[in-house]
């Protein structure tokens, strides 16, 4: 069956008749001809298109599935002679290269008039190439990939790709049945970039790059810079352009007014495909913002949105770094979701995965036949934990690819924060590697200096270009200066996940209350280092999968006690210095582990379910925690200032009690007291000093509306000799604030 060339618009009128054949063109050099047909020629534009020769202008066209090809000049059609192998040529007695089109006839009688891709000058400028060569193109997506545009007065798409080791590159499309023979690209010198402008190609066209390696192998690769991709399991890239009109100008204008460290920051972590399985980006925009706003969270954190082939990877094995996953809709549909969240007053953080990428043969791995995005040293290229490739952070073009990608999501999709995954695996050369499987750095150390420099460059660039954006590190070691500015030697992140607090506190609450006295330090140790970095306290997806159990199921005791433990824990967490993050489903005490196949168990909240009130009670507490948190500056204004915290009771191990004060910038305190024992403690003394003339309970996780027993302090409590005596409910946290008598 003949292949239909849809790369060019249909002619506006009838195809001109063919008056006759052209003169014979000089033959191609056999070597050039062989390389051209093999897809291994660096400059096909020097062979194809129109060129002066003795006697006129020679035209040469490569259309392997055509029956006949003609040239139309000034409305007259001239038939080119077949040279076999899909080549057609001829000479017209012209003084100069004219404006012309091609008429291509296919075997089944279909005929099209088209522009010739090989009559155009490069559609990529010298400045772009210079910046790419230096690794400093901060808007790389505007230079590489598939860019719909008007070039020399003709609409089409410019295709560009970085493949410095390739002998040749061709554009293969759906309309050529993935045969790239007709569309070889030209090399733009030492930049390693290949380019071709295809007239008439528009949005929705599926394409790949056909790479001819220096080893003689030919294979198809998805575009590393593709801004859209087919829905998996299909793997082609898709030409796209955004026409989205944003409605979040007010949000974007004001998001940088207050530093994130001095503002409320309560995060709801979401896996979009499973939050409400089956919903698209636009359908999620109808439900997610309203739900998050109702619960009082200030931000959502989206597990990776970039395209990935394997759903159960949850997005952490990315193949399309510049393309939102097509599973839920188009790139503009994703913009619609972000816009809806912003208009609801919700910030959007996105998980970003620059540590590694999968080995799928159509993706980044050995992209041009050689290690390109990954290091050439196999000891460094392989990630031992995940069976993936690591990025070559020492290569300027690779760093540019990743730094520009971070900027891309912030500028093109209005993302407010990037949570960088697996930072520790990037920073250490010996991460998960045995002796002999890694090589020390130039100073003999285990630190990956190139990865460190990359993270510093990424952070500095994002903060310079994108005011109000915050970067967050998932860094699980004691690497110093993760959130210290880059100009003082730090990595430059805005926040860091406090993995130590998470592990220690979950370890503590998992013990039976009678044994917690022996683990008291696990709840207090975090304050030893609480101000060494700017922390987020994460109860993330990683803690509720793979046998770790859901948060409520980690707790000891019967159902009432497990819920009480969760409520007490959340009250402690929200009051502790640092921002907080909670994964979906934990806000209503889902008992089952998270599964990406079914998502949260929303049916637990249904009125007809006999225990729905128990789950709604925890959900109501989370709503109240966020409401109180946002309205109480003492809980967020001085998260990074040691003067914003004071222990009141730090060593009451026998009682399982913790008490501390938080202070706002104006000195107004909040007293948080947690009783992790199952007994009521009456007249419990706390030396609060002269902070207030009286204290009023403002939150009690044991309140009946949250599913508790209703034990508490309904009346204001006055200090005597600097101490107050209050009732501590069992397995509960209470917050008290100054009360004006």
Curated annotation (Swiss-Prot):
Pathway(s) served: Glycan biosynthesis; glycogen biosynthesis
GO BP terms: glycogen biosynthetic process
Residue ranges the record marks as coiled coil: none
Region of interest (Disordered), residue spans: 1-38
Domain of life: Bacteria
GO CC terms, sorted: cytoplasm; cytosol
UniProt xrefs under InterPro entries: A-amylase/branching_C, Branching_enzy, GlgB, GlgB_N, GlgB_N_E_set_prok, Glyco_hydro_13_cat_dom, Glyco_hydro_13_N, Glyco_hydro_b
Alphabetized SUPFAM superfamilies for the sequence: (Trans)glycosidases, E set domains, Glycosyl hydrolase domain
Pfam families: Alpha-amylase, Alpha-amylase_C, CBM_48, GlgB_N
Subunit relationships: Monomer.
Name of the protein in its database record: 1,4-alpha-glucan branching enzyme GlgB 2
Gene: glgB2
């Amino acid at each position: 069956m003949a292949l239909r060339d849809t790369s060019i618009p249909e002619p506006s009128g009838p195809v001109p008749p063919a008056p006759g054949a052209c003169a014979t063109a000089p033959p191609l050099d056999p070597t050039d001809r062989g390389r051209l047909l093999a897809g291994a020629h660096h400059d096909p534009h020097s062979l194809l298109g129109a060129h002066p020769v003795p006697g006129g202008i020679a035209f040469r066209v490569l259309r392997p599935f055509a029956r006949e090809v003609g040239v139309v000049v000034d409305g007259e059609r001239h038939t080119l002679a077949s040279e076999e192998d899909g080549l057609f040529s001829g000479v017209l007695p012209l003084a100069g290269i004219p404006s012309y089109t091609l008429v291509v006839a296919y075997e089944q009688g279909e005929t099209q008039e088209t522009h010739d891709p090989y009559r155009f000058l490069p559609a990529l400028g010298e400045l772009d190439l210079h910046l790419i060569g230096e690794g400093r193109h901060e808007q790389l997506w505007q230079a590489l990939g598939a860019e719909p545009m008007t070039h020399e007065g003709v609409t089409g798409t410019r295709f560009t790709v970085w493949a410095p080791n390739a002998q040749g590159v061709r554009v293969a499309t759906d309309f050529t049945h993935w045969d790239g023979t007709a569309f070889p690209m030209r090399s733009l010198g030492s930049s390693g970039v290949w380019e071709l402008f295809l007239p008439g190609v528009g949005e929705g066209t599926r394409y790949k790059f056909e790479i001819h390696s220096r080893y003689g192998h030919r294979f198809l690769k998805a575009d590393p810079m593709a801004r859209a991709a087919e829905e998996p399991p299909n793997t082609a890239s898709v030409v796209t352009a955004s026409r989205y009109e944003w409605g979040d100008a007010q949000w974007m204008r004001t998001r940088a007014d207050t530093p994130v460290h001095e503002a409320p920051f309560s995060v709801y972590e979401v896996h979009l495909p499973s939050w409400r399985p089956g919903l698209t980006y636009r359908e999620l925009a109808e439900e997610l913002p309203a739900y998050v706003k109702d619960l009082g969270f200030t931000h959502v954190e989206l597990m990776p949105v970039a395209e990935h082939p394997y759903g159960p990877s949850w997005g952490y094995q990315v193949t399309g770094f510049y393309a939102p996953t097509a599973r839920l809709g188009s790139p503009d549909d994703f913009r619609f979701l972000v816009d809806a969240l912003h208009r609801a007053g919700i910030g959007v953080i996105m998980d970003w995965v620059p540590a590694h990428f999968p080995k799928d043969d159509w993706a980044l791995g050995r992209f041009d036949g050689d290690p390109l995005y990954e290091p050439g040293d196999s000891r460094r290229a392989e990630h031992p934990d995940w069976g993936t490739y690591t990025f070559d952070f020492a290569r300027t073009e690779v760093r540019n690819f990743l730094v520009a990608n971070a900027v891309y999501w912030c500028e093109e999709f209005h993302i407010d924060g990037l949570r960088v995954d697996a930072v520790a695996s990037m920073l250490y050369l010996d991460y998960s590697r045995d002796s002999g499987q890694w090589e020390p750095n130039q100073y003999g150390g285990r630190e990956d200096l190139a990865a460190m420099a990359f993270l510093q460059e990424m952070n500095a660039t994002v903060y310079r270009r994108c005011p109000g954006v915050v970067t967050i590190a998932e860094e699980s070691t004691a690497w110093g200066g993760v959130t210290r500015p880059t100009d003082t030697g730090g990595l430059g992140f805005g926040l860091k996940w406090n993995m130590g607090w998470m592990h220690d506190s979950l370890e503590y609450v998992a013990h039976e209350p009678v044994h917690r006295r022996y683990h008291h330090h696990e709840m207090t140790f975090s304050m030893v280092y609480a101000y060494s970095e700017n922390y987020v306290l994460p109860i993330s997806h990683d803690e509720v999968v793979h046998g770790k159990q859901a948060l409520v199921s980690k707790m000891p005791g019967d159902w009432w006690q497990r819920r009480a433990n969760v409520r007490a824990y959340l009250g402690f967490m929200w009051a502790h210095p640092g921002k907080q993050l909670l994964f979906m489903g934990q806000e209503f005490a889902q008992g089952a582990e998270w599964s990406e196949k079914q998502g949260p168990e929303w049916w637990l909240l249904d009125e007809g379910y006999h225990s729905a009130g128990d789950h709604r009670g925890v959900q109501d507490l989370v709503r109240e925690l966020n409401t109180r948190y946002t309205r109480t500056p003492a809980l967020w204004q001085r998260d990074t200032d040691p003067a914003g915290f004071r222990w009141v009771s730090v060593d009451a191990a026998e009682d399982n009690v913790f008490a501390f004060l938080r202070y706002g910038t104006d000195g107004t305190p909040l007293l948080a007291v947690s009783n992790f024992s199952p007994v009521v403690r009456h007249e419990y003394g706390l030396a609060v000093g002269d902070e207030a003339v009286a204290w009023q309970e403002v939150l009690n996780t044991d309140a009946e509306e949250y599913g508790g027993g209703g034990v508490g302090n309904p009346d204001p409590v006055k200090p005597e000799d600097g101490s107050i005596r209050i009732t501590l409910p069992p397995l509960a946290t209470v917050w008290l604030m100054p009360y004006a008598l």
